[in-house]
UniProtKB/Swiss-Prot annotation:
Keywords, sorted A to Z: ATP-binding, Ligase, Nucleotide-binding, Protein biosynthesis
Gene Ontology BP, a term: translation
Catalyzed reactions: L-glutamyl-tRNA(Gln) + L-glutamine + ATP + H2O = L-glutaminyl-tRNA(Gln) + L-glutamate + ADP + phosphate + H(+); L-aspartyl-tRNA(Asn) + L-glutamine + ATP + H2O = L-asparaginyl-tRNA(Asn) + L-glutamate + ADP + phosphate + 2 H(+)
Superkingdom, natural source: Bacteria
Function: Allows the formation of correctly charged Asn-tRNA(Asn) or Gln-tRNA(Gln) through the transamidation of misacylated Asp-tRNA(Asn) or Glu-tRNA(Gln) in organisms which lack either or both of asparaginyl-tRNA or glutaminyl-tRNA synthetases. The reaction takes place in the presence of glutamine and ATP through an activated phospho-Asp-tRNA(Asn) or phospho-Glu-tRNA(Gln).
Signal sequence extent: none
DNA-binding listed as a keyword: no
Source species taxonomy: Bacteria, Pseudomonadati, Elusimicrobiota, Elusimicrobia, Elusimicrobiales
Gene that encodes the chain: gatB
UniProt subunit comment: Heterotrimer of A, B and C subunits.
Protein name: Aspartyl/glutamyl-tRNA(Asn/Gln) amidotransferase subunit B
Length: 472
C-alpha cells in the first residue's frame, strides 16, 4: 500500500477589530445584531453615486497583524474588484487586494520549522443570507466589515500542524489587538486546501477545499477525515476530484458541495474608485515601533529571567493581558515561581469557573502579590491564603485587612512555639517514643497537637524545625 504525504494550505479570514466598516462609517461587528439591516448606509448597500472611503484604523490593524505574522509590508498596495453575483453581496463585487496586497512573504514557526505565509490582504466582508423553506432573507449588517485574508503556503503536512499554526496565528493577532479572533463569533474563519501525493514526490496532487469549519478542533478533525478518504481512494486506484467540500461534524465526514471554481471566473480588475494605498515611511515606522514584545519572546524571557517551567511560561503568555497581570504581580516583590503557581492554579481556576476574562478579575495583581508574599513570609499558611484569596475575590478588600479581620496571622514567635512544642511532647509520650525509634513522620502528629492548641495559628514549618531540635 502506497504511503502518501498530505499537503495542506490554509485560508484564514480575520475580522479586524475596528469600530466602523472598511469603506463607510457604519458600525462594525454588528453581524449578530438582532435588528437586521440596522447598521447599513448608502455606501455599504451600494446605492448609485456613493463612493468608498478607506478606514485608516483598519489599515493600521492590518499592518499590526501582518507584522505579528512576520510578513513584509508593501508601502504601496492596490484594491481590486472580485466580481460575482450573490444576494448578500450588495455591489455585485467584493473589494479585495489581488494584484498588490498590503503584505507578503511571512511565516510562523510550527513543529520546530517555519511554515510560510504567502500573503495577507485586506477585503470587505459580505452580508448574510437567512434561508427559509420557501424564501430567503438578506441581512447586510455584516457587509463591508473589514477583513484580513491570510493565505499560508502549502507547507503544512498534518492535522496537528494545522492546529498549531492556527493557535499561534490567533495568539499573535489577538496579542497585538488586531482582532479578537473568536471563531464562535465569526471573527476568524478557516478554509482548508488539501491534497495527497506519494511520499518523496514533489509534484502536487489534486486539491480539494473544505469549508464549514467552526472551530480549530473541527479543522483538525476534517483534515484527518479527508486524509483518510483520499488515501483510501488513491490506494483503490480512484482519482480525486477537484471540488469544494463541507465538513459534517455530526457524521464525521466531508460532503461534496460543488466543483471547485477557477479563480479566473471572478474577472478581477483594479477598483477605479480607490487610489493606490501609500503608506508613509514615518507612519509605518511609528506602527513598527509600537509593536509589543511577542508571545514567543516573552515566554523565553519568563523561563530565563523568572526560572519558570516551559509549561507555566506557556500558560502565562497564552494571552497578553494574563502575561502583564503576572509581571505586575512579580513587580510587587512576590516570588516569581510562587506567583506563577498561584495564577496558573487558583486564579485561572476561579476565572474559568466564573466565566470571566482576566481583565475582569476582581483580585488585582497587587492584591495577589500581597497574598503570595504573606504566604512565603510565613504570616499565613497556604490553606489560610486560599481563604484570604476567596474573601479578596468577594469583597475586593486588601489581603492584609482580611487577615486581621479573620484573625488568620500565624504565630512565628519561637518562644511561644517552643512552649507549645514542649507541652505537646509532655502530653504525647507514645508519639515521642515513635519519633525517637526512627519514625520521623510521627512528628506530624505532634505538629497537629500544636495546631489544636494554637487554633491553627502556629507556623507549621517552624514547628517542624523546633520538634526536630527538641527530639534529637
Amino acid at each position: 500500500m502506497t504511503q502518501f504525504e498530505p499537503v495542506i494550505g490554509l485560508e484564514i479570514h480575520l475580522q479586524l477589530n475596528t469600530n466602523s466598516k472598511l469603506f463607510c462609517s457604519c458600525p462594525s461587528g454588528m453581524a449578530d445584531n438582532p435588528i437586521p439591516n440596522s447598521a447599513v448606509c448608502p455606501v455599504c448597500t451600494a446605492q448609485p453615486g456613493t463612493l468608498p472611503v478607506l478606514n485608516k484604523g483598519a489599515v493600521e490593524l492590518a499592518v499590526k497583524a501582518a507584522l505579528a505574522l512576520n510578513l513584509e509590508i508593501n508601502k504601496i498596495s492596490l484594491f481590486d474588484r472580485k466580481n460575482y453575483f450573490y444576494p448578500d453581496l450588495p455591489k455585485g463585487y467584493q473589494i479585495t487586494q489581488l494584484f498588490k496586497p498590503i503584505s507578503e512573504h511571512g511565516w510562523l514557526e510550527v513543529n520546530g520549522r517555519k511554515v510560510g505565509i504567502t500573503r495577507a490582504h485586506m477585503e470587505e466582508d459580505a452580508g448574510k443570507s437567512i434561508h427559509h423553506a420557501s424564501y430567503s432573507l438578506i441581512d447586510w449588517n455584516r457587509a463591508g466589515t473589514p477583513l484580513l485574508e491570510i493565505v499560508s503556503e502549502p507547507e503544512i503536512h498534518s492535522a496537528d500542524e494545522a492546529y498549531e499554526f492556527l493557535t499561534k496565528l490567533k495568539s499573535n493577532v489577538s496579542w497585538v489587538g488586531a482582532s479578537n479572533a473568536d471563531m464562535e463569533k465569526g471573527e476568524l474563519r478557516v478554509d482548508v486546501n488539501i491534497s495527497l501525493r506519494p511520499a518523496g514526490i514533489k509534484t502536487f496532487g489534486t486539491k480539494v477545499e473544505i469549508k464549514n469549519l467552526n472551530s480549530f478542533k473541527a479543522v483538525r478533525d476534517a483534515i484527518n477525515v479527508e486524509i483518510e478518504r483520499q488515501t483510501e481512494m488513491l490506494n483503490e486506484g480512484k482519482k480525486i476530484k477537484q471540488e469544494t467540500l463541507l465538513f459534517d461534524k455530526e457524521k464525521g465526514e466531508t460532503v461534496s458541495m460543488r466543483s471547485k471554481e477557477d479563480a479566473l471566473d471572478y474577472r478581477y480588475f483594479p477598483d477605479p474608485d480607490l487610489p493606490p494605498l501609500v503608506l508613509a515611511d514615518e507612519w509605518l515606522e511609528s506602527v513598527i515601533a509600537s509593536r509589543p514584545e511577542m508571545p514567543a519572546r516573552r515566554k523565553e524571557r519568563f523561563t530565563k529571567d523568572y526560572g519558570l517551567s516551559d509549561y507555566d511560561a506557556g500558560v502565562l503568555t497564552s494571552e497578553r493581558a494574563l502575561s502583564e497581570y503576572y509581571e505586575d504581580t512579580v513587580k510587587t516583590g512576590a516570588n516569581p515561581k510562587n506567583a506563577a503557581n498561584w495564577i496558573t492554579t487558583d486564579l485561572l481556576g476561579a476565572i474559568n469557573a466564573a466565566k470571566l476574562d482576566i481583565n475582569d478579575c476582581p483580585v488585582t495583581a497587587k492584591q495577589l502579590g500581597t497574598i503570595v508574599t504573606l504566604t512565603d513570609s510565613g504570616k499565613i499558611s497556604r490553606a489560610q491564603a486560599k481563604k484570604v484569596f476567596e474573601q479578596c475575590w468577594q469583597t475586593k478588600k486588601d489581603p492584609e485587612v482580611i487577615v486581621k479581620e479573620l484573625g488568620l496571622e500565624q504565630v512565628s514567635d519561637e518562644n511561644q512555639l517552643e512552649t507549645w512544642a514542649k507541652e505537646a511532647i509532655a502530653e504525647n509520650p507514645k508519639i515521642v517514643s515513635d519519633v525517637k525509634s526512627g519514625n520521623p513522620k510521627a512528628i506530624g502528629a505532634l505538629i497537629g497537637s500544636v495546631m489544636k492548641k494554637s487554633k491553627g495559628k502556629a507556623n507549621p514549618g517552624k514547628m517542624n524545625e523546633i520538634f526536630a531540635k527538641l527530639l534529637q
